[in-house]
Regions:
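Hydrophobic ligand-binding cavity/cleft-lining segments
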Residues: 1-45, 49
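A generic structural micro-feature
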Residues: 1, 40, 55-61, 88-92, ...
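Beta-strand/loop substructures that line and gate deep hydrophobic ligand-binding cavities in soluble
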Residues: 69, 78, 82-130
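Intrinsic-disorder/low-complexity, polar/charged segments enriched in Ser/Thr/Lys/Arg/Asp/Glu/Gln
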Residues: 2-8, 45-47, 60-62, 76, ...
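A contiguous pocket-lining binding segment that forms or flanks enzyme active sites
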Residues: 135
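Generic structural detector for well-ordered beta-strands
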Residues: 8-10, 39, 53, 66, ...
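Glycine-rich portal/gate segments that line the openings of hydrophobic small-molecule binding cavities
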Residues: 39-83
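Short, highly charged C-terminal tails/helix-capping segments
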Residues: 138-143
Length: 143
């Protein structure tokens, strides 16, 4: 199942400060509700996991988060998320693009979900991901 989301956010922090914060995956990943960094694996990558609740189901996805593109002059960054459901056969993979402007920016997410999570239906999956990324976008302003 493919899910595409776009979330604008605003902040009063200087654009250089926000850009530096989004490049720090050990600060950025925990901004997603239920997510934590397990291990730093390189200058631009971490192993992470997230606990997600969809309806009556709780799932844990673990995998990698890696910055795959950086454009400091345009204040743009793209990260790749690849994860597998623990104890299941599902996957949750995403490309997350950050575009910053003075006063805020946009988070664009293109996700692919399979397994139990996808079986919950497009409406439920979209709603859960939308809420997670909306909350995450709000936390970007505080980094």
């Amino acid at each position: 199942m493919a899910v595409r989301l776009e979330h604008p956010f605003s902040t009063e922090k200087p654009i250089d400060e926000v850009y530096a914060a989004i490049l720090d995956l050990e600060r950025l990943v925990p901004c997603v509700q239920g997510a934590s960094v397990l291990e730093k694996t390189g200058p631009d990558s971490v192993k992470a996991q997230i606990d997600i609740k969809m309806g009556a189901m709780s799932m844990i996805f673990a995998g990698t988060v890696e910055i795959v593109e950086q454009d400091p002059e345009a204040y743009r960054m793209v990260m790749s998320v690849k994860s597998k459901e623990q104890g299941g056969s599902g996957y949750a993979n995403a490309e997350v693009a950050f575009s910053l402007t003075d006063g805020g920016g946009t988070v664009n997410t293109n996700a692919q979900i399979t397994g139990k999570a996808a079986s919950m239906g497009e409406g439920v999956v979209h709603g859960v991901l939308d809420a997670l990324i909306n909350d995450f976008s709000g936390k970007l302003a505080t980094l």
